[in-house]
C-alpha cells in the first residue's frame, strides 16, 4: 500500500500523541483531554463510536473514514491516559 507523505499510520499517530503528552504544548486538545481523565475520554469514544455506526448506515465512505479516524484518535488518547503502549494492544490482536 503506497501512501502520500501526509498520511499518518496508526503507529505514527501514537508517536505524535505520545510526544504531545510528554511535552504538553500550550493549547493542545490532546493535553486537555488527557488532563480531563478517563471519564471524559470514554464519553468521546462512545460518541465517536455512535457516529461511526451512523456514518456506516447513512453516509459516504469518505464520511465513514473520517469518523473512524476520529474514533482511532480518541482510542489512542485513552491508551495514553492509561499508560498502554501499542505493543500492549497489538499483543491482543
UniProtKB/Swiss-Prot annotation:
One GO BP annotation of this record: L-histidine biosynthetic process
Key words of the record: Amino-acid biosynthesis, ATP-binding, Cytoplasm, Histidine biosynthesis, Hydrolase, Nucleotide-binding
GO cellular component: cytoplasm
Protein's cellular compartments: Cytoplasm
UniProt xrefs under Pfam families: PRA-PH
MF GO annotations: ATP binding; phosphoribosyl-ATP diphosphatase activity
EC identifiers of the protein: 3.6.1.31
UniProt catalytic activity: 1-(5-phospho-beta-D-ribosyl)-ATP + H2O = 1-(5-phospho-beta-D-ribosyl)-5'-AMP + diphosphate + H(+)
Pathway: Amino-acid biosynthesis; L-histidine biosynthesis; L-histidine from 5-phospho-alpha-D-ribose 1-diphosphate: step 2/9
Chief site of localization: cytoplasm
InterPro entries registered for this protein in UniProt: HisE, PRib-ATP_PPHydrolase-like
Superkingdom in the source lineage: Bacteria
Keyword presence, Nucleotide-binding: yes
Keyword GTP-binding: no
HAMAP family listed in its UniProt record: HisE
Family: Belongs to the PRA-PH family.
Xref: NCBIfam families: histidine_hisI (TIGR03188), PRK00400.1-1 (NF001610)
Protein name (Swiss-Prot/TrEMBL): Phosphoribosyl-ATP pyrophosphatase
High-level lineage: Bacteria, Bacillati, Actinomycetota, Actinomycetes, Mycobacteriales
